[in-house]
Amino acid sequence: EFSGRSINLVMSNRGWKALEDVGLDEEIRKIGIPVDKRAIHLQDGKLNYQYYGKEGEAIFSLSRGVLNRKMVDLAEAEGVEFFFERKIWDVTLASATLWEGETEQGDWTELKYDKVFGADGAFSRIRHRMQRQSMFDYSQEFMKIGYKELHIPANADGSPKIDIHSLHIWPRGNFMLMGLANLDNSFTCTLFMPIEGENSFESLTNEEKLVSFFANYFPDTKDVIPDLVRDFFRNPTSYLAIMKCFPWTFNDKIALIGDSAHAIVPFYGHGMNAGFEDITILNELMQQY
């Protein structure tokens, strides 16, 4: 289902190692696009390239939705069972018991397990319960920058409007636009910008201001983002936060992994890779013990 708040993912060596360890790397490469360089779009229309490494070295662009669906398919093929549209409101840590219900105030059903891994994201319910334990450290910092998804469609003949093997960046000081390719030769673009201030989401209140802003700062996008106005005012402005906590485990019953343990901003390109690296460590521990 379209959410209008997606940032394409970038897979680097940290992530590939985790997938190789569990035998999923070849299947995931099939849905990725190799990206060997940055394409830097300057305000005067010039285009510069910065290669990431030696010839043949590349990171991979992955659609978040496509990756999620592929990972579910691969897991189901190995016998993993998924339950969708289920709401977990609380957890009893000592017994690894989840509490499920339709509403936070309604009747809950008890679900007991041997172990629970909290992979429930930056605003984790599992971590929220762990925060009430003594000696549990937690910090949360919201950035003053938000983001909004925009879209570059493929041409009518299916060809891409810009180079699919580049991570496209339009750097403009304290705000920027970036774009990564999808399998259908479209691009998912993300506008990162302050929430408030002179050049901010707060300041772009109507079509005239938006079109003028893009004409001034991103002039070469005029012909490649045909639905700029629709996308900008339809898609939500989302927020960015850094979250840290420790410890990530409770006895031998509960463990946090991924963003529930360590959410970071997307600029480093390592949020997903750090999450997969948790699986590298988990897999090593499973082999050891």
What is the meaning of each model-derived region?
Residues G15, P34, K87-I88, A122, ...:
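A generic "binding-loop/recognition-motif" signal
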Residues K37-L42, S95-G101:
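Short polybasic amphipathic segments
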Residues G45, G121-F123, H270:
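Short glycine-rich anion-binding loops that position phosphate/pyrophosphate groups of nucleotides
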Residues D73, A77, D90, L98-L240, ...:
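Conserved FAD-binding catalytic core of PHBH/FMO-like flavoproteins
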Residues F82-F84, G118, L256:
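A structural signal for the hydrophobic beta-strands that form the central parallel beta-sheet
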Residues F84-R86, T92:
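Short loop/edge segments at beta-strand edges and connector loops
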Residues L150, P236-Y289:
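Conserved mid-domain beta->alpha element of the FAD-binding
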